[in-house]
């Protein structure tokens, strides 16, 4: 468990930069917030074992994943 934590853990400053990048890249702040929340919720139900481990909260993981996919416009599109 410790090795996974070290691989994907980011500090709060980096997480906030990623959140700001997501919001700035989106035309609609509310819509991107809902998309991140829905991804976190979906992830929570798809992989309940990760939640029990507690190594990374679903919302943090969703922000990291979506910010990594920022280069794909359909992720944050308004359609």
Swiss-Prot record:
Listed InterPro entries: DNA-dir_RNA_pol_omega, Pol_omega/Rpo6/RPB6, RPB6/omega-like_sf
Gene Ontology biological process terms from the UniProt entry: DNA-templated transcription
Domain of life: Bacteria
Record-level Gene Ontology MF annotations: DNA binding; DNA-directed RNA polymerase activity
The keyword DNA-binding appears for this protein: no
Gene Ontology cellular-component terms listed: DNA-directed RNA polymerase complex
Catalytic function, reaction form: RNA(n) + a ribonucleoside 5'-triphosphate = RNA(n+1) + diphosphate
Keywords for this protein: DNA-directed RNA polymerase, Nucleotidyltransferase, Transcription, Transferase
EC id: 2.7.7.6
Quaternary structure and partners: In cyanobacteria the RNAP catalytic core is composed of 2 alpha, 1 beta, 1 beta', 1 gamma and 1 omega subunit. When a sigma factor is associated with the core the holoenzyme is formed, which can initiate transcription.
Sequence similarity: Belongs to the RNA polymerase subunit omega family.
Function comment: Promotes RNA polymerase assembly. Latches the N- and C-terminal regions of the beta' subunit thereby facilitating its interaction with the beta and alpha subunits.
Protein name per UniProt: DNA-directed RNA polymerase subunit omega
Species the sequence originates in: Synechococcus sp. (strain JA-2-3B'a(2-13))
High-level lineage: Bacteria, Bacillati, Cyanobacteriota, Cyanophyceae, Synechococcales
